[in-house]
Amino acid sequence: MTPDRLAAVRTALLRDMTIDIVTLGARSGKWRTTEIWYVVVDGRIYLCGTPGAGEDEREYAPRDWIANLKAHPEFRFVLKESIEETLDARAVIVTDPDERRRVFSADVTGWYRRQTGSLEALVEHGPMVRVDLLGSAAGLDLTMAGTVPPPREVP
């Protein structure tokens, strides 16, 4: 990837919100595409979700995408808003309660808090994956230092 393209990818990562993830099915072994939001907190990319949709919204309901990433952590992170680019990535399931609390407390994850009404439910049950980019995008500086677009707002 050229330096100009890497700069465009960095800008997109800081500005965009909706991506596709292409994962290998945990049980089926088939490639699955899921549209999902991502957030950038403290220079790291995260995929998050609300705990579930049971009788009690705070109950945990498993998600296929997270089951797929647990079984097969390498996946494709597909930018599709301001630019189109497919990035190789590795998922790291976030279990550390301090990291989970820090991410779910960030301004950019306010939508998730509003959906559940409980930071504690998110910390305890919300799906969360840290995304490590691989290949030429590995090591991109996703902090807000330098000239970058303003961060996007999650509705």
Which sequence ranges carry the predicted segments?
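Short low-complexity stretches enriched in small and charged residues
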Residues: 1-7, 33-34, 40-47, 84-88, ...
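Extreme N-terminal tail/first-helix region
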Residues: 1-20, 150-155
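Short, P/G- and charge-enriched loop/turn segments at secondary-structure junctions
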Residues: 6-9, 25, 115-120
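A generic structural micro-feature
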Residues: 13, 28-30, 69, 123
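Short beta-strand segments
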Residues: 16-57
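Short, structured beta-strand-loop surface elements
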Residues: 51-148
